[in-house]
Swiss-Prot record:
This is DNA-directed RNA polymerase subunit beta'. GO terms for molecular function: DNA binding; DNA-directed RNA polymerase activity; magnesium ion binding; zinc ion binding. Zn(2+) 2 binds at residues 867, 943, 950, 953. GO terms for cellular component: DNA-directed RNA polymerase complex. Mg(2+) binds at residues 499, 501, 503. The RNAP catalytic core consists of 2 alpha, 1 beta, 1 beta' and 1 omega subunit. When a sigma factor is associated with the core the holoenzyme is formed, which can initiate transcription. It comes from Prosthecochloris aestuarii (strain DSM 271 / SK 413). InterPro entries: DNA-dir_RpoC_beta_prime, DNA-dir_RpoC_beta_prime_bact, RNA_pol_asu, RNA_pol_N, RNA_pol_Rpb1_1, RNA_pol_Rpb1_3, RNA_pol_Rpb1_3_sf, RNA_pol_Rpb1_4.
Length: 1499
């Protein structure tokens, strides 16, 4: 921003900010005078020294309206400049904005521009950073003009010369000195900043650009082209920014009193020589203050020290030049000046940074003041401390309403003091402000009355740190309370993630009318009942409230007064109050409303004795006719509070039920009634938790008798596995996995037993069971450890990678009630402690992930209603849904807009038309209707809005279940929705105490649906074996790697379920079989992949040599010898190679089939032995993911996906459809070829030891992995395109969150982030555009560049065209057509043209960090990371920040362009005078949006 001389800062609003390198003229224009002395203040008078770093003459007075010498005091002398001391009489605040300057004795290079990577100066001059450094620090001379002497000596421009060489030339050609400096014959060589300045000044950028483009086109060397490209980027940046503008620009918005702009403010673009400074600015003294401490010492900003060093060295150098000191001394002083200026601008980048005297820490330079968490951007611009705020400890306020909070009187009086004072003065209670303050200090009783009036209807904001999502700040209506703690409503604790063990919260007072309005309309806690991340309610009763409701609605047979028939609910309540009816008694009530859920009447009729058969028959008839309702007294009490529209809720209410009910109430009757209902059930819950007297004792934890038997059985099984291992039929890996499986199963059985035991205890009224079953506290996992057995424990390791040995195979058999043995206790401490330490470490990681997500998505705002795209996502009903392995179909389409008609194939009708919104109800109906198998929905991923996204592609705003409004900051909401659970999940690990859960490997795969069996891509062999009973049987084994069994609906032919069949599986069904649910389809070996003989013959080993390619492992316990293939590379010479394989040969020795054997395989056959079809030749161990379901493994996975990192050992993926073949074997890799029918062939080299998934002759599709390992998202993008990679990322991230950790996040939030990762394209061929090859640019910028040349043509032959038309240049087609018409008229030769060539590009997948740094906004990127680099690049390119995102607007102090800060809303005016005003188009605003109401409030 520009402060003009003498006048106040301009008030004009600005809409963009341009970055450029400051020219010496602009530095001088901003300066008020030169700082000549290094002194700051006089040690005796403590007043600033004249011409020093704090000088009042330059920077303004230190006291308001008073000059330095005291001649002029008082405001009446405003603007006068004192004739004695030269200080202007003005306010002292100008010392925050007035700048000075230092004129340097020699030019000095700006460290940012030569130390940045790639060096900007180096790129322009084609010098390396090392060489530049030697020139700048006065080590070597650089030739600026070789002249005649240079030519004779063979010296070229830019050659570096040592001192001896330089002096040799100077002495040899003495007459050289007499020539003028600009004489081409003169030899000129210089060093230091001066040399660089001269060289940069002499550059011709246009010529450089042409030369470099030529190299790019013609050079054959990759290295030369890469270098040229690097240099061209910098040259082009300068060229683009340097477009000399006319000097007579009119003032923008009345910036200057004259009609013309004074010269220093005219931006002429960046000249390269500006990177070398002749004057340096001195920032205002109040921004580098000098503060007196007690004891007469001073605390000073480091910048003052750094400036002092510069001034001292500069003055010394000036003196030395004046006295004509010898060159050696001058050179040393110049170097020191260069170093001092370097330290001032960027001290942390230097190896020998300038340190302070006492504490020996590096001084904070100008760059350090901007960088990092403590820098200007993040500390002072993005987060500020605010007044009208306070903080205190929180306690529960059970009697508060949902929208209220209790505010301590002592806090309220401080926060609202100005308003109370005003009220006191207005009402005449106090005469003046001062007396009003006295009244307040005295705590006069009348003050409290006034305070009550003041806070009425004024909401306050409560915030609990860390504020992870928008529900971390909510508005409440304060009520005054005694004491010093803030009271908050128990139901909002979930949103704040607060508890009452000493948490603190901050209170903020919204001041302006608009702020109060927004707080009470948009932020009030009773309006924020729903989580934006999933659309599920967040204000859900917990703990005591749930327990109370559960207890209230539970039924018990044998209660007082059961089986009675009542006419109405009121009768029931009267009978209960008179103690004739027990709370849990089952009764019959006459009812004709809507019932939520019915009991099984048959079971209920059992409560009536058999001799009353008539009554029984009548009851049965009435219940079936739905005239009688069977319910309990407690449910009648509960239903008094349920809104009428919902009907009678007739079921036990647990936490899940409460959540569903609240969700239903919110959507059907609205927030107001929902808030009332919540307050009521809070009261009821607490009341009945108290009435029930529910607490637990040791006796409530019951240990099941069956535990001993189960453990005996498991011990037996594990011994059997050991015996098999000792015989050698199992590998070490299989033994381990099978034993872990056995104990895992037993632990689960014991857990189930103990759970059932608790359920039966006291007819289900065991308090421990009630707490567990209601969802109030505890989990089945904890009950298992209390009353069952602790089970298997994970062995803590740095990373959980699913390797064998991560679970200790000896389980803890005791439970916590019995107590652990010393050894068991010791084993379990490890896991428990690791959980606690993980928690603290991982929270930081989750916080950093959130920050990166915010930065990448902060500028995604809903900008338009409909982008008009026809594209969308295709969603199919997934099969794994039923088994819980995938997200439900309805969850994927809920709240979206259909891009095409959604059909019900069974009824052949449209369920949702194109453009229709899929609401909650429609989504649930579609989920229940199996006729709808797929849907096309609009998605953020395919939105074509130029800026931001459109509301149709986003769908509904999950927090209000209405279509999203224009102006909604969906990017920030997405970042919060993903980041918040990330932090939550990391905090959950320690509750399990490190016990292992999860993967029991299934050996049998069963049908989930009824239907007909179909095979897809399955090859089999038959193996004759003997079964357990000693009878012969035939097993059908699968020998294809990527086979599938599909279950098909026999009528419609639709595939209901697809099962992947592993290699070596044994099939139990054949094609066409009809199967029922739970029928076994196939069984497989979960812990290893088997290599199976497909033919009969003899085994022949190739390259399987003892000690080279395999080793013998002897088990120390059993003495059994295993043959394990090892990595042989280290055993052989460089030229040698091996490829271990098992061949099957016929009797005559002909090779029938070859099987490559991967590293770590166990051999199951011996050389030259006969084998039959189906025999196992070798087993390859498979790692099972077994570690518990905490997100410790999950968070790094999410980070890896968002950062689009290439996995450490990625799978090799086929790029084309075709058939697999194997090529030759090299030393460290073997060749895999994929060939298709068109003759196209791709070759891949696979590292030895990597497991190849494909067999010779297998058919593969593009994108299918050929080897094991994770697939790299970059490969998916390259082979299958952007849509596939977007879907892949969203699905993989969802897997971690929803399936592994059970956290619900809507797909849209992930899509918003993934969209941002694919916003850039890399230019391949620039064609005729201005773009450069390899440029990484925004997709929209690329499209615009192509659109700009779409109507243009290139002139090949200009014919008889006028002189202004040049060959090989671009012109508009219209212009050329017009000229050709004229040329034809005059019978002259025409202009020959060809169409302009468009640029080509490919999409790039960026990780969120690089995407945030590549954002179009300079300010946003600079405040994220790598501040100096971002600012350097922006300045060189003369970039403009259009202030479109949220972050940049916060930094420059404007309203954010989202929500009510949207431009369209800011200009809203309500004119009631003119009838025509109604016709003015204003954006549609929802009733709740306060923007339009602001003016009502103001009027």
């Amino acid at each position: 921003m520009i402060f003009s001389q003498g006048s106040s800062p301009f008030k004009g609003d600005f809409s963009k900010i341009k970055f450029s390198i400051a020219s010496p003229e602009s530095v001088l224009a901003h300066s008020r005078g030169e700082v000549l002395k290094p002194e700051t203040i006089n040690y005796r008078t403590f007043k600033p020294e004249r011409d020093g770093l704090m000088c009042e003459k330059i920077f303004g007075p230190t006291k308001d309206w008073e000059c330095y010498c005291g001649k002029y005091k008082r405001v009446r002398y405003k603007g006068i400049i004192c004739d004695r001391c030269g200080v202007e009489v003005t306010m002292k605040s100008v010392r925050r904005e007035r700048m000075g300057h230092i004129s340097l004795a020699v030019p000095v290079v700006h460290t940012w521009f030569f130390r940045s990577v790639p060096s900007k100066i180096g790129a322009l001059l084609d010098l390396s950073t090392k060489e530049l450094e030697r020139i700048i620090y006065y080590e070597v001379y650089v030739v600026i003009n070789p002249g005649d002497p240079g030519e004779k000596q063979g010296i070229k421009k830019l050659d570096r010369l040592t001192e001896e060489q330089y002096f040799q030339i100077i002495t040899e050609y003495e007459d050289n000195q007499d020539l003028d400096d600009d004489d081409p014959a003169k030899f000129v060589a210089k060093m230091g900043g001066e040399a660089i300045h001269t060289l940069l000044k002499g550059l011709n950028l246009d010529e450089s650009a042409v030369g470099l483009r030529k190299v790019l086109k013609e050079s054959g060397s990759e290295q030369k082209r890469a270098d040229a490209l690097k240099r061209l980027k910098v040259v082009e940046a300068f060229r683009k920014s340097y477009e000399p503008q006319k000097k007579t620009r009119k003032k923008p918005g009345g910036l200057f009193p004259e009609d013309e702009m004074p010269e220093p403010y005219i931006f002429e673009g960046n000249k390269p020589e500006y990177m070398v400074m002749e004057v340096i600015p001195v920032i205002p003294p109040e921004l580098r203050p000098l503060v007196p401490l007690e004891g007469g010492r001073f605390a000073t900003s480091d910048l003052n020290d750094l400036y002092r060093r510069v001034i001292i060295r500069n003055n010394r150098l000036k003196k030395l030049i004046d006295i004509r000191a010898p060159e050696v001394i001058l050179r040393n002083e110049k170097r020191m000046l260069q170093e001092a200026v370097d330290a001032l601008f960027d001290n942390s980048r230097k190896a020998n940074a300038v340190k302070t005297g006492e504490s020996n820490r590096p001084l904070k330079s100008l760059s350090d003041a901007l960088k990092g968490k403590q820098g200007r951007f993040r500390q002072n611009l993005l987060g500020k401390r605010v007044d009208y705020s306070g903080r205190s400890v929180i306690v529960v306020g059970p009697e508060l309403k949902l929208h209220e909070c209790g505010l301590p009187k002592s806090m309220a009086i401080e926060l609202f003091q100005p308003f109370v004072i005003r009220r006191l003065v207005e009402r005449g209670i106090a005469k003046s402000v001062k007396s009003a303050k006295k009244l307040i200090d005295k705590k006069d009783p009348i003050v409290w009355d006034v305070l009550e009036k003041v806070i009425d209807g004024r909401p306050v904001l409560l915030n609990r740190a860390p504020t992870l999502h928008r529900l971390g700040i909510q508005a409440f209506q304060p009520t005054l309370i005694e004491g010093k703690a803030i009271q908050i409503h128990p139901l909002v604790c979930t949103a704040f993630n607060a508890d009452f063990d000493g948490d603190q919260m901050a209170v903020h007072v919204p001041l302006s009318q608009e702020a109060q309005l927004e707080a009470s309309l948009l932020m009030l806690s009773s309006h924020n009942l729903i989580l934006p991340q999933s659309g599920k309610p967040v204000t859900v009763p917990s703990q005591d409230m749930v327990l109370g409701m559960y207890y209230l609605t539970k039924s018990r047979i044998g209660e007082n007064g059961q089986g009675n028939i009542f006419y109405s609910n009121e009768e029931v309540l009267i009978a209960h109050n008179e103690e004739r009816l027990g709370l849990h008694a089952l009764v019959f009530i006459k009812y004709d409303g809507h019932v939520e859920q019915k009991f099984d009447p048959v079971r209920l009729l059992d409560i009536i004795s058999d001799d009353e058969s008539e009554k029984k028959a009548w009851l049965k008839k009435e219940i079936e006719a739905k005239r009688l309702l069977v319910t309990t007294v407690g449910r009648v009490i509960f239903n008094q509070y349920v809104p009428e529209k919902i009907g009678f809720v007739n079921k036990v209410i647990d936490k899940k039920g409460a959540k569903e009910l609240i969700s239903k109430i919110c959507s059907e009757v609205g927030n107001v009634q929902a808030a009332e209902f919540l307050d009521n059930i809070k009261q009821v819950g607490y009341h009945y938790a108290m009435k029930g007297g529910l607490s637990i004792g040791l006796a409530d934890a019951i240990i099941p008798e069956a535990k001993i038997q189960l453990i005996k059985k498991a011990t037996k099984e594990s011994n059997k596995i050991l015996r098999e291992y000792n015989r050698g039929t199992l590998t070490e890996n299989e033994r381990y996995n099978q034993i872990v499986d056995v104990w895992q199963k037993v632990t689960n059985l014991v857990a189930e037993e103990s759970y059932q035991k608790l359920r039966k205890d006291r007819v289900g009224f065991n308090p421990l069971f009630m707490m567990l079953d209601s969802g109030a506290r505890g989990s089945r996992e904890q009950v298992r450890q209390l009353t069952g057995m602790r089970g298997l424990i994970a062995r803590p390791q740095k990373s959980m990678s699913g390797q064998p040995g991560e679970i200790i195979e000896n389980p803890i058999i005791s439970n916590l009630k019995e107590g652990l043995t010393v050894l068991e206790y010791f084993v379990s401490t490890h896991g428990a402690r690791k959980g606690l330490s993980d928690t603290s470490l991982k929270t930081a990681d989750a916080g950093y992930l959130t920050r990166r997500l915010h930065d990448v998505a902060q500028d995604v705002i809903v900008t338009i209603d409909d982008c008009g795209t026809t594209r969308g996502l295709h969603v199919e009903r997934s099969i794994e849904e039923e088994t819980g392995g995938q997200i439900k179909f309805s969850d994927k389409i809920r709240g979206r807009v259909a891009s095409r008609d959604i059909w019900d194939t069974l009824k052949d009708e449209i369920v949702v038309p194109a453009g229709g919104i899929i609401t909650e109800d429609i989504a649930d109906a579609i989920q229940a209707n199996i006729g709808v198998l797929e849907a096309d929905i609009r998605s953020v991923l395919t939105c074509e809005a130029k800026q931001g996204i459109c509301s149709k592609c986003y769908g509904t705003n999950l927090a209000v279940h209405k279509i999203v409004e224009i102006g909604e900051a969906v990017g920030v909401i997405a970042a919060q929705s993903i980041g918040e659970p990330g932090t939550q999940l990391t905090l959950r690990t320690f509750h399990q105490g490190g016990t292992a859960q999860g993967g029991i490997a299934e050996t049998e795969t069963k049908a989930v649906y009824e239907g007909q069996v179909e095979f897809e891509n399955i090859r089999t062999v038959e193996q004759e074996t003997i079964n357990e009973d000693g009878m012969p049987e035939v097993r059908i084994l699968v020998i294809q790697k990527n086979g599938r069994i599909n279950i098909v609906d026999p009528d419609s032919g639709k595939v209901l379920k697809r099962h992947d069949v592993p290699h070596g599986a044994s099939l139990h069904r054949s094609v066409g079989d009809l199967v029922k649910k739970e029928d076994v389809l196939f069984s497989s070996e979960p812990n290893s992949t088997q290599i199976i003989a497909e033919l009969e013959g003899y085994v022949k080993f190739a390259d399987i040599e003892k000690g080279v390619t395999y080793k013998e492992e002897v088990d120390p316990q059993t003495g059994y010898v295993q043959h394990v293939i090892i990595n042989w590379r280290s055993k052989l010479r460089a030229s040698e190679t091996r490829e271990p394989r098992i061949m099957i040969v016929s009797e005559s020795g002909e090779i029938l089939k070859t099987y490559p054997v991967p590293i770590k395989s166990n051999l199951f056959v011996e050389d030259n032995k006969k084998v039959s079809i189906g025999d196992i030749l070798a087993k390859v161990p498979r790692n099972l993911d077994r570690v518990g379901g905490d997100i410790t493994a999950g968070l790094p996975k999410v980070t890896e996906l968002f950062e689009a990192r290439i996995p450490s050992d990625p799978a090799i993926v086929s790029e084309i459809d075709g058939y697999v073949g194997f090529g030759s074997q090299r030393r460290s890799s073997k060749e895999i070829k994929v060939k298709n029918e068109f003759g196209e062939e791709k070759t891949y080299y696979v590292q030895v030891g990597k497991h190849v998934l494909a067999n010779e002759g297998d058919e593969v599709t593009a994108g299918e992995p050929l080897t094991d390992g994770a697939i790299s998202p970059q490969d998916i993008l390259r082979i299958q395109g952007p849509n596939a990679v977007q879907q892949y990322l969203v699905n993989e991230i969802q897997k971690v969150y929803q399936i592994n950790a059970g956290v619900e996040i809507s797909d849209k939030h992930l899509e918003v982030i993934v969209r941002q990762m694919l916003q850039k394209v890399r230019v391949e061929e620039p064609g005729d555009t201005e773009l450069l090859p390899g440029d990484l640019i925004d997709r929209t910028v690329f499209i615009e560049a192509n659109t700009a040349i779409a109507e243009k043509v290139r002139v090949i032959d200009k014919g008889d065209a006028p002189a202004r038309i040049q060959e090989d240049q671009l012109y508009k087609l219209k212009e050329i057509t017009k000229l050709n018409r004229e040329l034809r008229k005059n019978s002259k030769s025409l202009i020959v043209v060809e169409p302009a060539i468009q640029a080509t590009s490919h999409p790039v997948l960026l990780g969120i960090t690089s995407a945030a740094l590549q954002t179009e906004s300079v300010i946003s990127a600079a405040s994220f990371q790598e501040t100096t680099k971002v600012l350097t690049d922006a300045a060189v390119a003369g970039k403009i920040d259009n202030l479109l995102g949220l972050k940049e607007n916060v930094i420059v102090g404007k309203l954010i362009p989202a929500g009510t800060g949207l431009k369209a809303y800011r200009k809203l005016e309500l004119n009631k005078v003119y009838p025509e005003a109604a016709e003015i188009a204003v954006p549609e605003v929802d009733e709740a949006a306060p923007a339009s109401s602001d003016d009502d409030a103001a009027e």
